[in-house]
């Protein structure tokens, strides 16, 4: 059943397509998180992402179909200048740090500033402390991380790609927030300005019936 006040776009027979970008330093486990979520795979060896990789996931959340396009970006310093290419038109951003690495948490703050500067408050932010399987080696306090996330309007999560903890909850909650944001835009679009607010973020609201098999084409709306 559509959420109250969700409008016509939340009705049955339609799908949302959202773009999500993962940002963070190298070695914090961004690729491991995405592979665990999309393919339920985990590799103990470090996987280095060169520039960016792209995966998709289809979901049904409360009767609403969601097509996720997930961009996993490189963490190495030499690739940071490419960030705007990948997070442009994103509906959500997952900013990952390693709970055993204080510097990786501080670098997340730089990404938050950049995203807010480039995309304003229209993007849904998640700050994620990964590798909680190494809790005994933690160097980032839970209170500090959660307080910071709240101060910048983000939600904070803890995950372990190795143990498959917290990842489903992270993506599910982010999807719900992106749907809510899109619905606010739909309600605010006004007479005759169809999907104007959603278009600002690159949200695609698709009539599934004539293009039920074309979800992959609608996933990658990077403008």
Curated annotation (Swiss-Prot):
<feature type="short sequence motif" description="Switch 2">
    <location>
        <begin position="74"/>
        <end position="92"/>
    </location>
</feature>
<dbReference type="Pfam" id="PF00071">
    <property type="entry name" value="Ras"/>
</dbReference>
<feature type="binding site">
    <location>
        <position position="49"/>
    </location>
    <ligand>
        <name>GTP</name>
    </ligand>
</feature>
<dbReference type="InterPro" id="IPR005225">
    <property type="entry name" value="Small_GTP-bd"/>
</dbReference>
<dbReference type="GO" id="GO:0045202">
    <property type="term" value="C:synapse"/>
</dbReference>
<feature type="binding site">
    <location>
        <position position="48"/>
    </location>
    <ligand>
        <name>GTP</name>
    </ligand>
</feature>
<dbReference type="GO" id="GO:0050821">
    <property type="term" value="P:protein stabilization"/>
</dbReference>
<dbReference type="GO" id="GO:0003924">
    <property type="term" value="F:GTPase activity"/>
</dbReference>
<feature type="binding site">
    <location>
        <position position="133"/>
    </location>
    <ligand>
        <name>GTP</name>
    </ligand>
</feature>
<feature type="binding site">
    <location>
        <position position="30"/>
    </location>
    <ligand>
        <name>GTP</name>
    </ligand>
</feature>
<keyword id="KW-0378">Hydrolase</keyword>
<feature type="binding site">
    <location>
        <position position="26"/>
    </location>
    <ligand>
        <name>GTP</name>
    </ligand>
</feature>
<dbReference type="GO" id="GO:0032482">
    <property type="term" value="P:Rab protein signal transduction"/>
</dbReference>
<dbReference type="GO" id="GO:0006886">
    <property type="term" value="P:intracellular protein transport"/>
</dbReference>
<keyword id="KW-0256">Endoplasmic reticulum</keyword>
<dbReference type="GO" id="GO:0012506">
    <property type="term" value="C:vesicle membrane"/>
</dbReference>
<dbReference type="InterPro" id="IPR001806">
    <property type="entry name" value="Small_GTPase"/>
</dbReference>
<feature type="binding site">
    <location>
        <position position="75"/>
    </location>
    <ligand>
        <name>GTP</name>
    </ligand>
</feature>
<keyword id="KW-0460">Magnesium</keyword>
<feature type="binding site">
    <location>
        <position position="49"/>
    </location>
    <ligand>
        <name>Mg(2+)</name>
    </ligand>
</feature>
<dbReference type="GO" id="GO:0005789">
    <property type="term" value="C:endoplasmic reticulum membrane"/>
</dbReference>
<keyword id="KW-0967">Endosome</keyword>
<feature type="binding site">
    <location>
        <position position="31"/>
    </location>
    <ligand>
        <name>GTP</name>
    </ligand>
</feature>
<feature type="binding site">
    <location>
        <position position="162"/>
    </location>
    <ligand>
        <name>GTP</name>
    </ligand>
</feature>
<dbReference type="InterPro" id="IPR041833">
    <property type="entry name" value="Rab21"/>
</dbReference>
<keyword id="KW-0636">Prenylation</keyword>
<dbReference type="InterPro" id="IPR027417">
    <property type="entry name" value="P-loop_NTPase"/>
</dbReference>
<dbReference type="GO" id="GO:2000643">
    <property type="term" value="P:positive regulation of early endosome to late endosome transport"/>
</dbReference>
<dbReference type="GO" id="GO:0000139">
    <property type="term" value="C:Golgi membrane"/>
</dbReference>
<keyword id="KW-0472">Membrane</keyword>
<keyword id="KW-0449">Lipoprotein</keyword>
<dbReference type="GO" id="GO:0008089">
    <property type="term" value="P:anterograde axonal transport"/>
</dbReference>
<dbReference type="GO" id="GO:0019003">
    <property type="term" value="F:GDP binding"/>
</dbReference>
<dbReference type="GO" id="GO:0005769">
    <property type="term" value="C:early endosome"/>
</dbReference>
<feature type="binding site">
    <location>
        <position position="31"/>
    </location>
    <ligand>
        <name>Mg(2+)</name>
    </ligand>
</feature>
<feature type="binding site">
    <location>
        <position position="44"/>
    </location>
    <ligand>
        <name>GTP</name>
    </ligand>
</feature>
<feature type="modified residue" description="Cysteine methyl ester">
    <location>
        <position position="220"/>
    </location>
</feature>
<feature type="short sequence motif" description="Switch 1">
    <location>
        <begin position="41"/>
        <end position="54"/>
    </location>
</feature>
<feature type="binding site">
    <location>
        <position position="130"/>
    </location>
    <ligand>
        <name>GTP</name>
    </ligand>
</feature>
<comment type="function">
    <text>The small GTPases Rab are key regulators of intracellular membrane trafficking, from the formation of transport vesicles to their fusion with membranes. Rabs cycle between an inactive GDP-bound form and an active GTP-bound form that is able to recruit to membranes different sets of downstream effectors directly responsible for vesicle formation, movement, tethering and fusion. RAB21 is involved in membrane trafficking control. Regulates integrin internalization and recycling, but does not influence the traffic of endosomally translocated receptors in general.</text>
</comment>
<keyword id="KW-0342">GTP-binding</keyword>
<keyword id="KW-0479">Metal-binding</keyword>
